[in-house]
Amino acid sequence: ISHRRFATSCLEVRIIMRRIVNERNTKRKKAAIILKKTAAATMCVILAAGMTACGKKTDSAQSESVSENDKYSSDIFAMDTYMSLTAYGAKAEDAVTVAIHEIQRLDAMFSVGNTDSDVTTANMQGSATVSDETAYLVEQSLEISRKTDGAFDITIYPVMELWGFTTKNYKVPQADELQETLKRVSYENVSLKDHELVLKNNAQIDFGGIAKGYTSSRVMQIFKEYGIEHGMVNLGGNVQTLGTKTDGTAWRVAIQSPQGGNQYLGILETSDQAVITSGGYERYFEENGVTYHHIIDPKTGYPSDSD
């Protein structure tokens, strides 16, 4: 498989976000502020089932051979989140089944909780010979880190671990402990040459911010290989659509308010696109009346705080 034949949807969204930032702000501080506001502001929710009557017609013609009767859906738990896959077509069940196996394979390969994964081996030993797919994610992660001046950084893992977001044993770290751990955080500590991954200065990595985007692209590729023209996946807030709905209308994705509840910031109509956002209100803890969420600023080691 040539992994450069398709772009990771997660990467596309993050790169577009950062391009906007870079065009308007040449200074690191301003760029970081905008990124924090963007990241903390949104969380996407799929509305394909509940709001199907309102979609606009797209350029795609309504399918005469595919209908709701050709639908197959399945839910799984992987990559520490709940996922939903839906496909329409004669081979919909086969496509979803194969896609689920692929998700599970990638989860095992990228997971920091799997002792046999490339990531865990590198984190434990400081180096590892990695697979094509792991190498691809490392390369793309480093590219994003350079484009964002370190606002996106896969070496944030030790800080996430310190806060307890990886184990759910939450705590506010001591300031001196946090500063010491931050010394290990820098994408410049990561090097890759000919599939040899090296982590310097006791750095450790985690693909939590990029793996689901790559995975959703793989699912879309599998759907296409099985002749699926209409489909949707929701990988824990990473929503990607294939074609339109079977009636020719666009898929509808709501952007949920960061305050939670049933409030939405807006609804996007989309086809053959991904909608990926992140919000701090679903993964957080409270201590002494203060809420701490999981979107950590690599510069400070503390949860990102919007103005």
Question: Model regions: which residues?
Answer:
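Mature catalytic core of soluble alpha/beta enzymes
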Residues: 5, 10, 14-44, 48-307
